[in-house]
């Protein structure tokens, strides 16, 4: 296994044009932990869940309108994704199911887990083939839901308390995910359901969220040590860069823009910092405080190509939008 430590490099911020412009809206339901926004491909509504408020909701950016759909007490939804038909699917994190919401009627269809131990659906992503891959952190599993039949298949991790967490799906429908309780990244063959794991060199490493660039490289934030990591699955080689805020950074939410730049949030500092890293230059090029709220903690975020924006929810009860400057328009 090859480990390369790279020197951190934070470029000077642009002087003639901001790299990032952040706007926040206060969610009208107090202390509800709005999180994991997802852009509806049919309406451009921003769907999100209230983990502490037991709801699914959407936000209309143009009118600043919020609409809420109630869930049963104790569901504590953790994540939401919206399919090509505009149907939201949520992870019932404390209720052992994945739910499908009909926005027109409010009707919810529940897909229960086949194993009572699979109690906490966590982070989900479509596979592009009529299914949803999802992690189950405390159940120590990763699952796949067939959206048409409702069949759920589960794969157990090899280590106890591996805690599969952040998850992405590649263009072939194959899931890749972090094992937050260990120093491992992993993937599952969608045809055989065979688990393959990759050890990270540092035993103390704890990858939490991740992204995957089109060249097949896996990027992760090491939450415990304060590093950005690059894993080449073909060779197992790992390169790491110290985060701008160092060991206290606690990198959490992560996404990738349409220029394959990596964005993540340092949650160990207040206000939280939205940081950009360019794999082309191997440099951190942007560092923006999440203001005015400070955010508390940003746990997950998504990039919307149409508006060149990153959407996120905050523990301080805001929904946020960060408009990103394209590489060619940045002025150093």
Label the model's feature ranges.
Residues 60-64, 102-106, 146-150, 189-193, ...:
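Short loop/turn segments that connect beta-strands within beta-propeller blades
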Residues 23-26, 67-72, 109-113, 153-157, ...:
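Beta-propeller fold detector
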Residues 14-31:
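A short helix->beta-strand "capping" segment at the edge of beta-propeller domains
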Residues 46-52, 88-94, 132-138, 175-181, ...:
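Conserved beta-strand positions in repeat-built beta-propeller and related beta-rich domains
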Residues 295-332:
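Blade-level signature of beta-propeller repeat domains, shared across WD40, Kelch, NHL, RCC1
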Residues 124, 133-144, 152-155, 159-185:
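Solenoidal tandem-repeat scaffolds enriched in leucines and small polar residues
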């Amino acid at each position: 296994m090859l480990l390369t430590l790279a020197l951190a490099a934070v470029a000077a911020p642009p002087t003639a044009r901001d790299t990032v412009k952040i706007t926040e809206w206060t969610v009208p339901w107090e202390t509800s932990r709005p999180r994991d926004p997802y852009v509806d491909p049919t309406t451009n509504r921003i769907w999100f869940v209230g983990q502490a408020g037991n709801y699914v909701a959407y936000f209309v950016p143009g009118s600043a309108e919020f609409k809420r759909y109630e869930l049963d007490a104790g569901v504590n939804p953790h994540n939401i994704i919206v399919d090509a038909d505009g149907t939201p699917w949520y992870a019932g994190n404390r209720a052992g199911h994945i739910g499908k919401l009909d926005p027109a009627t409010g009707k919810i269809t529940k897909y229960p887990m086949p194993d009572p131990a699979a109690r906490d659906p966590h982070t989900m992503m479509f596979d592009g083939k009529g299914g949803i891959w999802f992690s189950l952190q405390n159940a120590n599993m990763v699952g796949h839901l067939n959206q048409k039949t409702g069949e759920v298949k589960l794969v157990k991790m090899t280590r106890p308390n591996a805690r599969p967490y952040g998850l992405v799906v590649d263009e072939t429908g194959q899931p890749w995910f972090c094992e937050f309780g260990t120093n491992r990244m992993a993937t599952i063959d969608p045809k055989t359901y065979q688990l393959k794991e990759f050890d990270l060199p540092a035993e103390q490493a704890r990858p939490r969220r991740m992204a995957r660039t089109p060249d097949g490289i896996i990027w992760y934030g090491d939450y415990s040590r304060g590093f950005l990591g690059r894993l080449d699955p073909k060779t197992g080689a790992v390169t790491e860069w110290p985060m701008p805020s160092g060991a206290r950074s606690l990198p959490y939410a992560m996404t990738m823009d349409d220029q394959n730049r990596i964005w993540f949030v340092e949650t160990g500092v207040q206000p939280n910092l939205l940081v950009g890293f360019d794999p082309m230059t191997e440099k951190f090029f942007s560092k923006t405080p999440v203001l005015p709220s400070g955010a508390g903690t940003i746990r997950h975020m998504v990039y919307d190509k149409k508006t060149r924006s990153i959407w996120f929810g905050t523990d301080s009860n805001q929904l946020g939008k960060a408009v990103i400057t394209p590489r060619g328009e940045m002025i150093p």
